[in-house]
């Protein structure tokens, strides 16, 4: 049998037991040994079947401790709204000109925001933005006349979440360099947002399992009673 890489054999902590959120965070951080500031990621198994329209889960949460990411924002807007977006810190602002850039392959951004009147234009980029999860949507606040606030939210810790086919939500909730307390606050904020987004068709236990991991490290189970789930 081939030897496991040293990075794997060096992992510490019980991966089978369910830990309090504080203990799980400490274990994840202790195993985040890459030479870069690893993202701390959460996975939440939900008691839903996303194949049914009344069991979809989608929303946005403003993480109190931020994300630790430098979020690059593109905004489709004109005139005064374009000026507001630029003043709020958006990296790329435009209308037809921005459409042409993206249609030509430009993708140097992490979030797309649009004013409602721009959606007819933005909709033509569906095949480009949709598969990447970048299509603006009013349900998560990225189609809005208040582009300045949307830009500030995106850069200040707003994280979109959406249930995947297997009934799982994945999200980044900070960096390994964050304090344990800051990460715990973000975890609890996301869980609260998920509970608020519980669909009408969900029956039985909604939040079934929660796990935490880092970009390059192992995952650890979280005792859901420790996060009020």
From Swiss-Prot:
Coiled-coil residue spans: none
Which organism's genome codes for this protein? Caulobacter vibrioides (strain NA1000 / CB15N)
Similarity comment: Belongs to the universal ribosomal protein uL1 family.
Q: Which InterPro entries match?
A: Ribosom_uL1_bac-type, Ribosomal_uL1, Ribosomal_uL1-like, Ribosomal_uL1/biogenesis, Ribosomal_uL1_3-a/b-sand, Ribosomal_uL1_CS
This chain belongs to which protein, by name?
Answer: Large ribosomal subunit protein uL1
Q: Name one GO biological process term.
A: regulation of translation
Can you list the GO cellular component terms from the UniProt entry? cytosolic large ribosomal subunit
Assembly with partners or alone: Part of the 50S ribosomal subunit.
- Pfam families linked: Ribosomal_L1
Q: Which UniProt keywords apply?
A: Repressor, Ribonucleoprotein, Ribosomal protein, RNA-binding, rRNA-binding, Translation regulation, tRNA-binding
Q: Which domain of life is it from?
A: Bacteria
SUPFAM superfamilies, alphabetized: Ribosomal protein L1
Q: What is the taxonomic lineage of the source species?
A: Bacteria, Pseudomonadati, Pseudomonadota, Alphaproteobacteria, Caulobacterales
One GO MF term attached to the UniProt entry: rRNA binding
Summarizing the function annotation, the protein's role is:
Binds directly to 23S rRNA. The L1 stalk is quite mobile in the ribosome, and is involved in E site tRNA release. Protein L1 is also a translational repressor protein, it controls the translation of the L11 operon by binding to its mRNA.
